[in-house]
Amino acid sequence: MERIKELRDLMSQSRTREILTKTTVDHMAIIKKYTSGRQEKNPALRMKWMMAMKYPITADKRIMEMIPERNEQGQTLWSKTNDAGSDRVMVSPLAVTWWNRNGPTTSTVHYPKVYKTYFEKVERLKHGTFGPVHFRNQVKIRRRVDINPGHADLSAKEAQDVIMEVVFPNEVGARILTSESQLTITREKKEELQDCKIAPLMVAYMLERELVRKTRFLPVAGGTSSVYIEVLHLTQGTCWEQMYTPGGEVRNDDVDQSLIIAARNIVRRATVSADPLASLLEMCHSTQIGGVRMVDILRQNPTEEQAVDICKAAMGLRISSSFSFGGFTFKRTSGSSIKKEEEVLTGNLQTLKIRVHEGYEEFTMVGRRATAILRKSTKRLVQLIVSGRDEQSIAEAIIVAMVFSQEDCMIKAVRGDLNFVNRANQRLNPMHQLLRHFQKDAKVLFQNWGIEPIDNVMGMIGILPDMTPSTEMSLRGVRVSKMGVDEYSSTERVVVSIDRFLRVRDQRGNILLSPEEVSETQGTEKLTITYSSSMMWEINGPESVLVNTYQWIIRNWEAVKIQWSQDPTMLYNKMEFEPFQSLVPKAARGQYSGFVRTLFQQMRDVLGTFDTVQIIKLLPFAAAPPEQSRMQFSSLTVNVRGSGMRILVRGNSPVFNYNKATKRLTVLGKDAGALTEDPDEGTAGVESAVLRGFLILGKEDKRYGPALSINELSNLAKGEKANVLIGQGDVVLVMKRKRDSSILTDSQTATKRIRMAIN
């Protein structure tokens, strides 16, 4: 106050005002401040002052030949005076206008290609819809977000190689383009940018925007996909938000979204198989998302989600060191603990073995709809500060924190038995048992927790056991805050290990992730996910299992028919027939299997009764463990479309229909593929298959002994000849090939040669 009074007094004297307004600025310190260094100290002022001059711009001397001295209005465009300190000319802003209107034009064909990301952004904004503005408190939390819509997911190094190859192909330097995406992008861009006149540096800069994911750690209250982040400044302020729907989607957001869905489906499916880890890897390697191999996406995509991280861990990739519990990401910010096995009694006197964390620790908890700071000591919640979008979200966070605290009153609040199981019908571990129990109903937990009076702290209020806010009382140690808790910002990745039950541990042995943490939320993927693995056939229901099983047999028919005749047991045990078993009524599985296997054996024994279509049709039924019974069936039942449908043993049905004219098979009305060979040739099919590896020499030759059956052929040595009985009792002479390489042609030539030999 004193200083201000003093200044007021000074200003009231006219001499002071005169000194301040009229004196020249020639004080050395001031001159130094504004003239030292290349950095402009007051750019706005400099700009205004420059533009007030007649010739504020300098240009290359060549401009004098390219621009007239005066424009149509007779205004001077450039001055004959040289720019002090360089050999450039001084130019008027009017020259720029003249150049824009009358200057040389060039082809614009490359602009949309080079500035693709900008053109696409304009389109998205043009078609986007902005809704009303709402004024309300914004709970923003900093999250790592993608700020660059429409990019591929190359690493900085991969992108650098692509850019060098496209923009500076003749520069020296080793460039290794290895990944599929690198090669494709390089090829496309080279084509697009032929004869491009845009400055190479600009092209390189724009290519980088297209190829590399750029992330920033920004405060966000709403959507986090890149098409929302690009308009963050328009959609959320400190106390307002504006509704916005993007006018288009970009592939990178779609990849992230589809990757999460694929990973969740795969982890859920792997959990119920005999060897979860092996199954998970098999599925990751055989799945494509939007036409790109899932394993390639996993290697490049930094998305952090429980299922995605489990898949990454299985592939030996590093993942974030934070751990997951109850759908929240926990990051320890201070403290430490040791784990001790302990037996505790629930309120129902059930004994639980839990690993108790002994020691004081602090964590941040970040979920989709709520965040919190948790301070705990051994079996004690010290403090929980939680913020969330609504009552429900806040309650979810409180339950997870209370269970995680391992407090006795939480364990005693259990009513009834804990027997939750996972998808594979295995009991969950005790901590997840407790979590599931209270997620179903937390009333007793909240009632038994205890409440305490609270102090009035800015931005904090209390919350009562019925989840209503209060300024007087609160659940013991729990407060609700207006401020969110930031996500963990570090992008550090750590080496982890994974066991066959898909539990992911850090190097100290702490569990970071397990299948229990994978969300059950179902979504519809934006990009097509193609699961080639038979384990994923059931994801689209029984019909898809049926169609896929038959498609698989037809695609692999050449190999299948050889196995059918030479090693049926191995064929019946193929995992591709596993999903099909769930369609066959439980009571009938063994009987159907026994019946079909007997039928197949008769076909092998009695030559000439071979029927390709029938084998394909009945094969999946033979995969179940067979029951020995003399039962005969004319039709077999499968459970699809909510009821039992019949497959006729002889003849077509709506489920399995083979069209002789087109040689195509339809299953439930869906095309399941074409049979490449002609099933009407009776035995030719299996014989040409079985005679692979044999050369047909001609008619029977008595010198080589009695005719063998097809099954006995496998005992011949290479180069050995024998008579063999085929088809309708005809006998031909064959020789076992010395080389395996020509086997492929055998089955085609065999059919022709058999006919010649017989006729």
Swiss-Prot record:
Motif residue range(s): Nuclear localization signal: 736-739
Site-annotated residues for Avian adaptation: 627
A GO term, aspect molecular function: RNA-directed RNA polymerase activity
Chain's role: Plays an essential role in transcription initiation and cap-stealing mechanism, in which cellular capped pre-mRNAs are used to generate primers for viral transcription. Recognizes and binds the 7-methylguanosine-containing cap of the target pre-RNA which is subsequently cleaved after 10-13 nucleotides by the viral protein PA. Plays a role in the initiation of the viral genome replication and modulates the activity of the ribonucleoprotein (RNP) complex.
Subcellular location(s) of the protein: Virion; Host nucleus
Assembly: Influenza RNA polymerase is composed of three subunits: PB1, PB2 and PA. Interacts (via N-terminus) with PB1 (via C-terminus). Interacts with nucleoprotein NP (via N-terminus).
Source organism (scientific name): Influenza A virus (strain A/Chicken/Victoria/1/1985 H7N7)
Gene: PB2
Similarity remark: Belongs to the influenza viruses PB2 family.
Protein keywords: Cap snatching, Eukaryotic host gene expression shutoff by virus, Eukaryotic host transcription shutoff by virus, Host gene expression shutoff by virus, Host nucleus, Host-virus interaction, Inhibition of host RNA polymerase II by virus, mRNA capping, mRNA processing, Viral transcription, Virion
Protein's name according to its UniProt entry: Polymerase basic protein 2
An individual GO BP term: cap snatching
Cellular component per GO, a single term: host cell nucleus
Pfam entry (one): Flu_PB2_3rd
